[in-house]
Regions:
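Non-catalytic terminal/accessory segments
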Residues: 1-169
């Protein structure tokens, strides 16, 4: 084995000057014949796991990794808190940019629950922080807020992944 190899990755990686951090690397049995809660792993912000689809066929599913969802919520909360003083259109433009970016990266098939959770959390956070813009009186009630959201174009969650088309020749 070449030097720097951990024994868990192909030895050909050294040909490309790639190194693997042994403390971050592990071998995992990831098979549809051995599904369990322990057989999940996170990679590039997604959690990969096996689940049976409607036809009963085991498929690899992806969802937003819980740590990444928490981090995204934390970043969005800080942005909302720091920019709550902006005029409505400017605030919505910045909020929509952040929401769309999240949807475009994490908008894969099977992940709509996490997208909607992020959207609902963002709405609640906007309501909380836009109501704290000075003065003792609240800016608006929840009913007024939801009515206003229907009138403005706030980015809604959606699946952005394009399904692969099977072409038979």
């Amino acid at each position: 084995m070449p030097s720097g190899s951990t024994g868990c990755c192909p030895s050909g990686w050294s040909d490309f000057l790639l190194q693997v951090a042994p403390e971050k690397t592990r071998l995992l049995r990831f098979s549809r014949f051995h599904p369990s809660r322990k057989r999940r792993f996170a990679f590039l912000g997604f959690e990969f796991f096996w689940l049976k689809d409607r036809q009963g066929i085991a498929r690899v599913k992806r969802r937003t990794a819980p740590k990444k969802l928490q981090a995204a919520c934390r970043r969005l909360k800080e942005w909302i808190r720091d920019h709550r003083h902006l005029p409505g259109r400017e605030f919505l433009r910045g909020l929509n940019q952040r929401l769309r970016g999240h949807y475009q990266y994490f908008g894969v098939r099977g992940n709509s629950r996490a997208l909607h959770r992020f959207f609902d959390w963002a709405k609640a956070c906007v309501f909380k922080w836009r109501n704290r813009r000075g003065g003792k009186r609240r800016s608006f009630t929840w009913a007024e807020f939801t009515q206003a959201l229907k009138q403005v174009a706030i980015a809604r969650p959606g699946i952005t992944e394009v399904a692969r088309r099977r072409v038979f020749a």
